[in-house]
């Protein structure tokens, strides 16, 4: 039987592009873990993706995950758009390369390990876990030791 995990994610970018960060909160029963990270130059969408990737990557074994995000880009991308992108060799319906393809491939690999229910919550609407993820992401984006987002392409 798979463990049931609640995973909340958010990304933030100060400028877009600019310094960015991600935050994730994982809840398993009475256990809670918060993770975050920041990058010198990135975009909001990349940080939204990174939050989901890093949250899922934290799980050591296959789990039943209820992932809540305020990003329709992430939720629709992974549940709908990715099917066509993969069929078309990671091209959009307009025959353009998929943006953030490096992170979409990483997310696709992480998703394959788990059973995931994707939920959307309106950002900045007072949802406690989403607000906490936003705080983690903003704090990470404002940090002094920011990593390089090697996949970012202007």
UniProtKB/Swiss-Prot annotation:
It comes from Aeromonas salmonicida (strain A449). Its cofactor is Mg(2+). Binds 1 Mg(2+) ion per subunit. May bind a second metal ion at a regulatory site, or after substrate binding. Residues 126-147 have a biased composition (Basic and acidic residues). This is Ribonuclease H. Its EC number is 3.1.26.4. The gene is rnhA. Endonuclease that specifically degrades the RNA of RNA-DNA hybrids. Mg(2+) 1 binds at residues 10, 48, 70. One of its GO terms (molecular function) is magnesium ion binding. Its main location: cytoplasm. Keywords: Cytoplasm, Endonuclease, Hydrolase, Magnesium, Metal-binding, Nuclease.
């Amino acid at each position: 039987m798979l463990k049931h995990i609640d995973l909340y994610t958010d990304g933030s970018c100060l400028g877009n592009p600019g310094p960015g960060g991600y935050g994730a909160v994982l809840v398993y029963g009475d256990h809670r873990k918060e993770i975050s990270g920041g990058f010198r130059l990135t975009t909001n969408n990349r940080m939204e993706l990174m939050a989901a990737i890093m949250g899922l990557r934290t799980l050591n074994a296959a789990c039943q995950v209820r992932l809540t995000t305020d990003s329709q880009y992430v939720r629709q991308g992974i549940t709908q758009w990715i099917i066509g992108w993969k069929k078309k060799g990671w091209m959009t319906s307009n025959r353009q390369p998929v943006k953030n393809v490096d992170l979409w491939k990483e997310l696709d690999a992480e998703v394959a390990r788990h059973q995931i229910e994707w939920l959307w919550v309106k950002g900045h609407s007072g949802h406690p876990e989403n607000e906490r993820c936003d705080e983690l992401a903003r704090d990470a984006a404002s940090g002094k030791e920011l990593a390089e987002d090697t996949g970012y392409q202007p």
